[in-house]
């Protein structure tokens, strides 16, 4: 998905609620229980536009920009992103948060929760890395080939219509920036090293798994393994859906998460 730091957003309500202060860039709206949303490796704030608008009337929704391309290259890893999240939470004074993470963002949520369980009320993982991921970021054998990148981006979705020209153009630009590509490779390798399988059984936190049945990047068996290893996990499937459920089926995603949060926290 598009880089939050490198693409000019034009997302109406989201853009109007985006702030920059003390070195952090984030979107925030609403009041009530706090939902903190974590984007993925190619993730953009705009990926969560529908979630932001849907939940902000009843929840405080906060979406920080993760510093994917601004950390020192050799220190660009999942642990550093978890530490960044901790610093952001401290800065905002956030407690008892409900983390929502897509892809790499889910992995960051897992690592953060394993280290700061007292700060986390619940987790929602959608197409999360942490166990296995067949990622675009793993290698760039043909990164200068536009058609190759176009096909890779299309694999993110069940319906390739979602792989818009803007999305492909931005991904192509990111992977052909040497400094960005280097950091993506470091993050992809870090995600493999930081396998969470041994930690998951200890994470006694209510967890909602929302997964696309047609996800080829973190396939359905990954969701099933998460459900088996996490003590308090509920798994929900979205049909005809790939690696970005909140983009491909935003209404179904929001409805599923809303019902789960209502059942868990009586809202």
Describe the residue ranges of each PLM region.
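Short beta-strand/loop motif that positions the catalytic acidic residue
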Residues: 203, 209-211
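Alpha/beta-hydrolase fold catalytic core
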Residues: 1-35, 57-59, 73, 95, ...
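Catalytic active-site module of serine/aspartate enzymes centered on a nucleophile-bearing elbow/loop
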Residues: 234-267
């Amino acid at each position: 998905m598009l880089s939050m730091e490198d693409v000019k957003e034009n997302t109406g309500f989201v853009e109007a609620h985006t702030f920059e202060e003390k070195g952090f860039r984030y979107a925030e709206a609403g009041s009530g229980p706090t939902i903190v949303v974590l984007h993925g490796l190619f993730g953009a704030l705009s990926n969560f536009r529908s979630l932001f608008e849907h939940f902000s009337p009843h929840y405080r929704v906060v979406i920080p920009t993760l510093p994917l391309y601004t950390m020192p290259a050799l220190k660009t890893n999942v642990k550093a992103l978890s530490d960044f999240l901790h610093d952001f939470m401290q800065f905002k004074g956030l407690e008892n948060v409900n983390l929502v993470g897509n892809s790499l963002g889910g992995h960051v949520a897992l690592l953060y929760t394993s280290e700061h369980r007292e700060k986390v009320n619940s987790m929602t993982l959608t197409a999360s890395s942490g166990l296995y991921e067949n990622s675009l970021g793993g290698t760039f054998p043909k990164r200068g080939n536009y058609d190759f990148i176009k096909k890779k981006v299309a694999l993110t979705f069940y319906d390739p219509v979602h792989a818009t020209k803007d999305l492909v153009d931005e991904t192509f630009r990111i992977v052909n920036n040497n400094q960005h590509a280097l950091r993506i490779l470091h993050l992809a390798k870090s995600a493999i090293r930081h396998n969470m399988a041994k930690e998951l059984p200890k994470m006694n936190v209510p967890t909602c798994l929302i997964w696309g049945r047609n996800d080829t990047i973190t396939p359905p068996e990954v969701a099933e393994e998460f459900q088996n290893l996490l003590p308090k996990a509920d798994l929900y499937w979205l049909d005809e859906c790939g690696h970005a459920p909140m983009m491909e089926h935003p209404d179904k995603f929001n409805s599923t998460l809303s019902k789960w949060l209502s059942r868990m926290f009586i809202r």
